[in-house]
Amino acid sequence: CMFPTISGFTRETCDTMVGIGSTKGRTIMPDVSVPRWDAVDIEALCKGAGLIAFDLDNTLARSKKPMKDDMAKVFSVLTSLIDVAVITGGKYALLQSQVVDRLTGTANRSRLHLMPTSGTRYYRWNGRRWTLVFAHDLSDEERAKAKEALERNAREQGIWYSHACGERIEDRGSQITFSALGQLAPIEAKEAWDPTDEKKRRLTQAVAAELPELDVRPGGASSVDISQRGFDKSFAVRELAGTLGMEVGRIVFIGDRMEPGGNDYPAALAGTRAVKVTGPADTVRLCDGIIAGLSR
């Protein structure tokens, strides 16, 4: 079995994964190694799965771009077979334009779960429209402190540039996001800006030291996110599992930033069946396999 590996973990223990990671506690798995999409055992991955969860940017689509036709097709088919979630650091409006607006006629919206701003907000389809189930918003004081600390430290570190494409600091209510090049910068520029994640880590550490009551973490290729402490993708998958009455170990989580420190990695630590992709093309091929596995 090629799920996240723990010492002594074998294919025969796949069924026990449904008990790993409590939806009520804070139990995590140590020493998680997340397999690539082309190294997973599809049959084992699908066995007992209750939900397929995805990161958005560079997993379902390029940053800020809508899903392409091939992705929209397989994603929509998946919602007709199993519950599907999208958990992203982006705001709700981006989920609408990148995912919801691209759904095909085969999609079952009632089985789709939208969790923007790293899962601090949760939306469900009620048959007529998308409704907010919960929101864990920052206070006015917390938002002000986060914005001030981000700008000041970014300036001190030389990464507050004279020109930016779009907003540099975006207030998403439940999350404050700093984008070094601006929210609307080309994806190629974002990906080239900090290939080793050193700049994001340095800014994250400086701001976190000033705001110990908040959770400060690297976001996408050129961003840093701030939310209430404990509200990352591990919280999101536990909260979703609890809402749906399933164990976290029945959730398959697919993302591109599955290395320690990556914003998808907390979902692996929470006990999901985590899988790493390097881009939407990988995700399409993985989904083809999952659809075949679920259809048997």
What is the predicted function of each stretch?
Residues I6-F54, D70-V77, D101-R102:
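Non-catalytic pre-domain segments flanking phosphatase-related domains
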Residues P30-R36, D41-L51, M67-K68, S227-R229, ...:
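Mg2+-dependent phosphoryl-transfer enzymes with acidic/Ser/Thr/Gly-rich catalytic loops
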Residues R62-S63:
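An N-terminally biased module of ancient metal coordination in phosphate/nucleic-acid-related enzymes
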Residues P66-C165:
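Active-site phosphate-binding/coordination module
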Residues Q157, Y161-V252, N263:
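Conserved acidic, metal-coordinating active-site core of Asp-based
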